[in-house]
Design a protein with these regions (language model features):
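C-terminal catalytic/acceptor-binding lobe
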Residues: 1, 7, 174-283
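Hydrophobic targeting segments
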Residues: 3-8, 46-47, 55-60
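Short loop/turn segments at strand-loop or loop-helix junctions that form parts
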Residues: 5-22, 62, 146
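Active-site-proximal specificity loops/subdomain of glycosyltransferases
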Residues: 19-30, 34, 61-113
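Short, acidic, metal-binding catalytic loop of nucleotide-sugar glycosyltransferases
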Residues: 24-27, 42-54, 79-80
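Conserved catalytic core of nucleotide-sugar-dependent glycosyltransferases
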Residues: 92-107, 122-200
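Short acidic donor-binding/metal-coordinating loop in glycosyltransferase active sites
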Residues: 119
């Protein structure tokens, strides 16, 4: 009835994206080493631990990726035959490469689902199952999971709740007739789309905040126990141990928590109101 593709971009060259939030150059060997570390510790184990394995993970790397990094990537993905690496000519070739593979792979399949995840983030073990449960043979329907967590891993470790509408974990159900795929537009452009389902009863993603994020800052809130969620968000044993031992107690950042809670909920309500009254352009 459908085929489901989880899609991730990695080190694709982009003329509009060349520095971190700390003004450090992106896509250097140092950057790549750090990013593969995040990927192998957070993103990969969370995707590999999905209860539902009826999907393919398409990962797109730049064609200029150094040979030693390619070897490391292939070794990481080798245990998982439904995880596939592609080496392409930068961001300019990204969307066309997605469509080319899916067109060939999904022949005679009436519907497709495409989901996105950043290479340094994490998903709940039921993420794929929950997305597929929304499938009702819709010709075009975006799925926006509003609730998740924010985990800062450096310089200090903090964990909190987070809400984010039109977020980077969005999915798209489509009839398989020249499908656009979820990556045809940036995630924040889904505010213009009227054909959209919101899932607000589960926290199904975890945004990882680190010093080399392009834009994100830690804005988690409330007292969340790592022990309560670590069996749902699977990370490496090394990271699990590190977080368990070094997480800062909520009482030590209570003021920041309150500030973040007010800010996150203000932004959420503001965007919902703008959507409701039609301030965003509706397609």
């Amino acid at each position: 009835m459908f085929k489901h593709y989880l899609i991730t971009r990695f080190n694709l060259k982009n003329k509009n994206w060349d520095v971190t939030k700390n003004n450090e150059t992106l896509l250097t060997r140092e950057w790549m080493t750090h990013r593969i570390g995040l990927f192998s510790n957070f993103c990969l184990p969370s995707v590999a631990s999905q209860i539902n394995t009826n999907f393919k993970w398409l990962l797109f790397f730049d064609a200029t990726t150094d040979a030693d990094f390619k070897t490391e990537i292939e070794a990481l993905l080798k245990p998982y035959p439904h995880f596939k690496a592609f080496y392409i000519d930068g961001m300019d070739a990204f969307h066309s490469s997605i469509k080319s593979y899916i067109t060939d792979d999904s022949k005679n399949t009436p519907y497709i689902i495409t989901s996105r995840i950043d290479n340094d983030d994490c998903i709940h073990k039921d993420y794929i199952s929950t997305i597929q449960q929304q499938f009702k043979s819709q010709d075009f329907m975006a799925i926006d999971i509003l609730k998740g967590y924010s985990l800062q891993v450096s310089p200090d470790i903090m964990l909190g709740k987070k809400e984010h509408i039109f977020n980077p974990f969005i999915s798209l159900i489509e009839k398989n007739e020249t499908p656009k795929t979820v990556w045809f537009s940036d995630h924040n452009m889904w505010k213009k789309e009227s054909r959209r389902i919101e899932i607000a009863n589960q926290r199904l993603w975890m945004s990882i905040i680190h010093e080399k994020n392009k834009v994100n800052e830690f804005d988690g809130y409330d007292n969340v126990s790592w022990d309560d969620i670590k069996t749902d968000f699977i990370v490496s044993d090394e990271i699990n141990s590190k977080v368990s031992k070094n997480i800062i107690p909520h009482k030590e950042w209570r003021y920041l928590s309150l500030k973040n809670k007010l800010y996150v909920n203000y932004v959420l309500m503001s965007k919902k109101l703008k959507k409701a009254v039609g301030l965003y352009k509706i397609k």
